[in-house]
């Protein structure tokens, strides 16, 4: 009788083990289907994941080949990442908190400066989706070889500015409800821009908020000014014949009120002056304040070294100030 009872117990254990093995084999596919279902319904955006790996022993999963596009522009990427590895902290989990570390590997984000238009409420849906599929709290998001692309497809010439080889981290990310106020994250990212210039961006913002409150500092050193000709011609109607220098910009927004400055230190500057009319655009209001002012300085006061400071001020709810969008 006892032997028979042990036999039933053994059979039960074997069946449970087999069920767990089958579940483990099916889990990546189940998670992939769940995530793709969420990513397919993000208002004006849509996304897809190619593959998912589950690492139960370390409480982690890896998402591979994530791509997010706009539904009306499927050929233009908004975001893509080769791998996103998310690992949950067991220590925090035992305390009743879901806290994770995330590694973002070979990721790109594309931002577009276009004509002013009202942003539909649906465009916030991608943020809601992020809140649903990532852990409650991200202790650290590590960026490995990332890229940020800025485009203006309507300017003449078109502008394509790329920050690449980006490495750094973002800390204290939270997808908690914003009823109790903003959830600021700190970031410090370094990389390259304009072929050979070094760039560093640091500050704080609420990435799932409305971008009406933030602080940031951008510093670029070792700029070959001729590499800026797309930007200077599109927004300031002049080209650089030669020159090099450094650039610092600090911006702060509080309840949509934007303040800050841009400060270049440029050496051996020569320019080709173009038409006086400035390119109309959306983010152009800020760019024109910076680039247009530089153009006037170059025209009126040519020197071997130029150091000046341009004030930036405005309201982010004003459609003439900014409309970076996917």
Where do the language-model regions lie?
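Amphipathic hydrophobic-ligand
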Residues: 44-46, 73-87, 124, 155-171, ...
């Amino acid at each position: 009788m006892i032997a028979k009872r042990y036999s039933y117990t053994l059979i039960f254990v074997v069946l449970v083990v087999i069920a767990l093995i089958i579940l483990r084999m099916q889990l990546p596919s189940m998670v992939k289907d769940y995530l793709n279902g969420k990513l397919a319904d993000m208002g004006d955006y849509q996304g897809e994941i190619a593959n998912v790996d589950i690492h139960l022993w370390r409480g982690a999963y890896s998402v591979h080949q994530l791509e997010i596009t706009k539904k009306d522009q499927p050929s233009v990427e908004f975001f893509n990442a080769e791998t996103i590895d998310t690992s949950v902290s067991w220590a925090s989990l035992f305390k009743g908190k879901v806290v994770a570390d995330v590694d973002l590997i070979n990721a790109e984000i594309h931002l577009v400066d276009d004509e002013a238009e009202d942003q539909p409420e649906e465009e916030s849906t991608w943020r809601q989706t992020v809140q649903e599929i990532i852990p409650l709290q991200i202790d650290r998001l590590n960026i490995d070889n990332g890229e940020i692309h800025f485009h203006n497809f309507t300017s003449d010439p078109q502008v394509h500015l790329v920050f690449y080889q980006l490495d750094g981290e973002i800390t204290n990310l939270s997808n908690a409800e914003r009823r109790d106020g903003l959830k600021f994250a700190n970031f410090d990212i370094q990389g390259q821009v304009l072929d050979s210039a070094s760039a560093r961006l640091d500050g704080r913002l609420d990435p799932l908020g409305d971008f009406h409150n933030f602080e940031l500092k951008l510093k670029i050193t070792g700029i070959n000014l001729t590499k800026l000709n797309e930007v200077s011609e599109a927004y300031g109607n002049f080209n650089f014949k030669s020159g090099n220098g450094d650039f610092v910009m600090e911006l702060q927004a509080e309840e949509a009120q934007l303040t800050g400055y841009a400060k270049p230190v440029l050496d051996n500057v020569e320019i080709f002056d173009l038409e006086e009319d400035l390119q109309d655009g959306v983010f152009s209001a800020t760019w024109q304040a910076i680039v247009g002012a530089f153009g006037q300085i170059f025209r009126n006061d040519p020197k071997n070294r130029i150091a000046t400071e341009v004030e930036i001020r405005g309201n982010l709810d004003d459609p003439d100030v900014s409309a970076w969008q996917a």
